[in-house]
Design a protein with these regions (language model features):
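Canonical AAA+ ATPase core
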Residues: 87-90, 127-202, 210-216, 258-263
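P-loop (Walker A) phosphate-binding loop of NTP-binding proteins
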Residues: 46, 80, 148
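Walker B catalytic acidic pair
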Residues: 45, 108-109, 120
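C-terminal engagement/docking regions of AAA+ P-loop ATPases
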Residues: 56, 237-316
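Pre-Walker A (pre-P-loop) alpha-helix and adjacent loop at the N terminus of AAA/AAA+ ATPase modules
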Residues: 3-41, 46
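Conserved C-terminal "switch" segment of AAA+ ATPases
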Residues: 3-7, 20, 157, 174-245, ...
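Conserved alpha-helical scaffold flanking the Walker A/P-loop in AAA+ ATPase domains
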Residues: 31-32, 86-106, 135
Length: 316
């Protein structure tokens, strides 16, 4: 699948999801960057903004299997990965798959889970497999996690470990709709019988696999590779940042830039592509100093400052 075909397919998905969910197009694009870029997406929003509905309809539009895991403080790793159950008829233990065995997994309120359970999800996200009772089992392909978390200021939530956060290609937020959007939401509800809207399937599973290979055909000028590296390195020199973007984060910025270029139907990356994805790809990877955290420094402002300070190469 070339970039032009990928663009047309992504537009169909964006239009289909937009028919069911009232949100900014950039939000949907961020999620598709995660899908096309072969990464995972972290959504941070207060309850009731439509995170679960979004994940479910993305899976439906892409023609993929979907499961939801509600993370709670007492959730065990086996509740996510599955467990062996004794079969009395055969006198053997049979493995019963957990909800992690789906193409798209919604990890709801991930920052309420104990570290041991988070570690099980971490292995699945990074390796595409889970280990149960010493036995490794492959997960379906494609495999994509959409995790949600409530803002850490809310009661009963805990910040995700740095290693966990770094595994997400993109972190984004729906936010509250504006007044016109909220009225549109009510008008849509008034025009249907079902409480929740649904979308039609746009893709087949094999189609999604082809789409995720499309960014590998996108060209990136050597000057832009230097630009990406310079952006990442600049985050490590800011006095408000204790831990800047890791080399893995640098690579993810490159991959997300190619994925966004694919969404735009271009066969090459531009500086604007890099700037467009820098916020959702980089901001959540920064660890602030204690002083910066106490003073409520916004990570997004740091990324904006980095983008303003790094010279943009001229690409012909």
């Amino acid at each position: 699948m070339d970039a032009s075909q990928a663009h047309d397919e992504c537009e169909r998905v964006l239009e289909t999801i937009g028919e069911a969910i009232v949100a900014d197009r950039r939000f949907f694009e961020d999620i598709l960057v995660g899908v096309v870029g072969r990464g995972h997406v972290l959504l941070e929003d207060v309850p009731g903004t439509g995170k679960t509905l979004t994940a479910r309809n993305v899976a439906r539009a892409l023609g993929l299997s979907f499961s939801r895991v509600q993370f709670t403080p007492d959730l065990l790793p086996s509740d996510v990965t599955g467990t062996h159950i004794y079969n009395e008829n055969d006198a053997t233990f049979e493995f019963t798959e957990g909800p992690i065995f789906a193409n798209i997994v919604l990890a709801d309120e991930i920052n309420r889970a104990p570290p041991k359970t988070q570690a099980a999800l971490l292995e699945a996200m990074e390796e595409g497999q889970v280990t149960v009772a010493g036995e490794t089992r492959e997960l379906p392909k494609p495999f994509f996690v959409i995790a949600t978390q409530n803002p850490v200021e809310q009661e009963g939530t805990f910040p995700l470990p740095e290693a966990q956060v770094d595994r997400f290609l993109v972190k984004t937020s729906m936010g509250y709709p504006d007044e016109a959007g909220e009225i549109e939401l009510l008008e849509r509800r008034a025009s249907r019988d079902a409480q929740s809207p649904t979308v039609e399937r746009v893709f087949e599973e094999s189609h999604v696999r082809d789409l995720r290979l499309a960014p590998e055909t996108i060209d990136t000028d050597p000057d832009l590779l230097s630009y990406i590296a310079a952006i990442a390195r600049q985050t490590r020199t800011d006095g408000r940042v204790a831990v800047g973007v890791s080399p893995r984060g640098t690579q993810r910025l490159f991959e997300a830039s190619r994925a966004y270029a694919t969404l735009q139907g271009r066969e090459y990356v531009t500086p604007d592509d890099i700037k467009r994805v820098a916020q959702p790809v980089l901001a959540h990877r920064l660890v602030l100093t204690p002083d910066a955290a106490v003073n409520d420094v916004e990570k997004s402002h740091i990324v904006e400052g980095v983008l303003d300070s790094v010279p943009v190469p001229t690409i012909e």
